């Protein structure tokens, strides 16, 4: 996979270019440069660790939107087996901005679904850049109700800039579709685990984000509006997105401190896209242990705990 570096990663990119140049020289001239390459690799690793240990909120937002960041299909391929995709909301369309279907986790049946932004231009357009319309949310709800009927736990992957704000989506009652999902997910009698893998934009994320365990990856974000949108409203200047991101508290560690999510999963050095297999392995271990624990909770108690979790958010003494 071709690496892409963000602006704040430029020192890392420069070192990587030097390492690649030395490898080419050594390969062409049969010169042993292994010691120098090893020294630069160690320096690059140290530099990467130093940069990523002190990222600003706006830089984390850029990481959450990284063009190579793993998407729902990447996690499905690595975490689950026997995935069988299910299409459509049975009313309007195939609803491709959310992908979902039945799969197995360690041999046990689960229902898995999540936003899919797409990777190449054609797929991005087909997936509507991961921005769900009413049909996507109704499709998601159909799959979750199917999971409830067949006693399968639900795993959702959240990565969207927000619900699609187009005229057609409004005509098909976008707000009702989101509200209905919030209402239904709070009552569905099966374990639900929600994982924020990239950006979680407002109601577009919440519509598949009500669960018994809410998990965020280290460099993911959760917000009611994008930093650019916030800056445009407050200061009439989208270039102040960095300042807005800092004030909004959108990062995983801030969200966790405010007790809005249950846990934050560390990412491989440099972000999840640097080692997708390792990131998926960490999530698989976590999902396995969390689902085992949730299955032991009586369903009536599970629903009550889920309800109380969300009712307690934002409460003040």
Swiss-Prot record:
The gene is accA. Pfam families: ACCA. GO terms for biological process: fatty acid biosynthetic process; malonyl-CoA biosynthetic process. It catalyses: N(6)-carboxybiotinyl-L-lysyl-[protein] + acetyl-CoA = N(6)-biotinyl-L-lysyl-[protein] + malonyl-CoA. It comes from the Bacteria. Belongs to the AccA family. Residues 32-293 form the CoA carboxyltransferase C-terminal domain. It is found in: Cytoplasm. This is Acetyl-coenzyme A carboxylase carboxyl transferase subunit alpha. GO terms for cellular component: acetyl-CoA carboxylase complex. NCBIfam families: accA, AccA_sub, PRK05724.1. Keywords: ATP-binding, Cytoplasm, Fatty acid biosynthesis, Fatty acid metabolism, Lipid biosynthesis, Lipid metabolism, Nucleotide-binding, Transferase. GO terms for molecular function: acetyl-CoA carboxylase activity; ATP binding; carboxyl- or carbamoyltransferase activity. InterPro entries: Acetyl_CoA_COase_a_su (IPR001095), ClpP/crotonase-like_dom_sf (IPR029045), COA_CT_C (IPR011763).
């Amino acid at each position: 996979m071709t690496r892409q570096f963000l602006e704040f990663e430029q020192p890392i990119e420069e070192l990587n270019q030097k390492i690649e140049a030395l490898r080419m020289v050594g390969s062409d001239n049969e010169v042993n440069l292994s010691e120098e390459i090893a020294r630069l690799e160690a320096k690059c690793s140290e530099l990467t660790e130093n940069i990523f240990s002190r990222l600003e909120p706006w830089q984390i937002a850029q990481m959450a939107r990284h063009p190579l960041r793993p998407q729902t299909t990447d996690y499905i391929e690595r975490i689950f087996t026997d995935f069988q995709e299910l299409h459509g909301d049975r009313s309007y369309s195939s609803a491709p901005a959310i992908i979902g279907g039945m799969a197995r986790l360690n041999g046990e049946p689960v229902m898995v679904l999540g936003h899919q932004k797409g990777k190449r231009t054609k797929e991005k357009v087909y997936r509507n850049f991961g921005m769900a319309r009413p049909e996507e949310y109704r499709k998601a709800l159909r799959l979750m109700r199917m999971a409830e009927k067949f006693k399968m736990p639900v795993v959702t992957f959240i990565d969207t800039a927000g619900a699609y704000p187009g005229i057609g989506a409004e005509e098909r009652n976008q707000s009702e579709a989101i509200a209905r999902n919030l209402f239904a997910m709070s009552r569905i009698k099966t374990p639900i685990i929600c994982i924020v893998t990239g950006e979680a934009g407002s109601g577009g994320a919440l519509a598949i984000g009500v669960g018994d365990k809410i998990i965020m990856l280290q460099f993911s974000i959760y917000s009611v509006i994008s930093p650019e949108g916030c800056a445009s409203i407050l200061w009439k200047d989208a270039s102040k997105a960095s300042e807005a991101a800092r004030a909004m508290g959108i990062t995983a560690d801030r969200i966790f401190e405010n007790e809005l999510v249950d846990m934050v999963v560390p990412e491989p050095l440099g972000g999840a896209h640097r080692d997708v297999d390792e990131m998926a392995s960490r999530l698989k271990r976590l999902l396995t242990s969390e689902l085992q624990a949730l299955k032991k909770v009586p369903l009536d108690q599970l629903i009550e705990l889920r309800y109380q979790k969300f009712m307690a958010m934002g409460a003040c003494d």
